[in-house]
């Protein structure tokens, strides 16, 4: 029964990671009444979710996701929480594609839009990626093209059990924090952008609890990614160590640009803006934003020694049009399989 755990939350006390995993396993398998679920989510929100609770909920979602074979090699994901209120171009999606063209294996987990007019799924779909490809097809994309897209609704069907309550409550809950943490392929390396500075350290501690080999959590002057318009807060996770510092465009050998210079549009417009970037023909601010975030992922995954070297690798790849070749190759593999 959940009542003793609810009582714990009502008293302002935290659940353990294992307790939260048990609770959320019941939620995503449809075993929790909507009124109880509403109380649980509200109590967690008022108390403030701990890293242990967030990690426990994420573990439950991963354990109950549609299975996908995890590679033995290292691979990464780069994702933002969304919800930063700015309609920027798809920086993390473009950075994923660019990093993949520089030798990083990237399994991009994503959904339709949250904060921008065009989410990662919208963009990958515009490039011809079959969103409802099978897990086996996604794994083949990663093996052959260095890049795959994992469309969240394909893997996390259990989330539907919480949707009526989430829709009724009309407020952020722990579920809004889980999207970046529940990649069903379970990457070894992770770069997460968060929408508020106060989330940087809790997310870093959560990633530690989830056992990532290396990870970065960033917040860039109001954005859920590294910023070209100002300084970015960063916490780097390396096993048991947490290293907190600030990054600016100059650390990547890049110029600063105003926030307005990286605003996006509807999916078709975004697709063209990103296609130009991937082909080395993008606007200077767009190219810098993508190079900065791709460069950080490239360094995190050990392909570059410094952030500046990572950004240069990203720019060189874009000018050689390699990212465009990668997304086209991955999309072709995704379409070569039957629909699940």
Swiss-Prot record:
Sequence positions that bind Mg(2+) 1: 92, 225
Cofactor note: Binds 2 magnesium ions per monomer.
Keyword Nucleotide-binding among record annotations: no
Gene Ontology biological-process annotations: L-tryptophan biosynthetic process
Family, per entry: Belongs to the anthranilate phosphoribosyltransferase family.
GO cellular component: cytosol
Membrane-spanning residues: none
GO terms assigned for molecular function: anthranilate phosphoribosyltransferase activity; magnesium ion binding
Annotated anthranilate 2 binding sites: 166
Function of the molecule: Catalyzes the transfer of the phosphoribosyl group of 5-phosphorylribose-1-pyrophosphate (PRPP) to anthranilate to yield N-(5'-phosphoribosyl)-anthranilate (PRA).
UniProt cross-references to NCBIfam families, sorted A to Z: trpD
Listed cofactors: Mg(2+)
Binding, Mg(2+) 2: 224-225
Disulfide bonds: none
InterPro entries reported in the protein's UniProt record: Anthranilate_Pribosyl_Tfrase (IPR005940), Glycosyl_Trfase_fam3 (IPR000312), Glycosyl_Trfase_fam3_N_dom (IPR017459), Glycosyl_Trfase_fam3_N_dom_sf (IPR036320), Nuc_phospho_transferase (IPR035902)
Biological pathway: Amino-acid biosynthesis; L-tryptophan biosynthesis; L-tryptophan from chorismate: step 2/5
The protein's name: Anthranilate phosphoribosyltransferase
Residues that bind anthranilate 1: 80, 111
Residue sites binding 5-phospho-alpha-D-ribose 1-diphosphate per the record: 80, 83-84, 88, 90-93, 108-116, 120
Natural source organism: Pseudoalteromonas atlantica (strain T6c / ATCC BAA-1087)
Sorted UniProt keywords: Amino-acid biosynthesis, Aromatic amino acid biosynthesis, Glycosyltransferase, Magnesium, Metal-binding, Transferase, Tryptophan biosynthesis
Catalytic reaction(s) noted: N-(5-phospho-beta-D-ribosyl)anthranilate + diphosphate = 5-phospho-alpha-D-ribose 1-diphosphate + anthranilate
Quaternary structure (record): Homodimer.
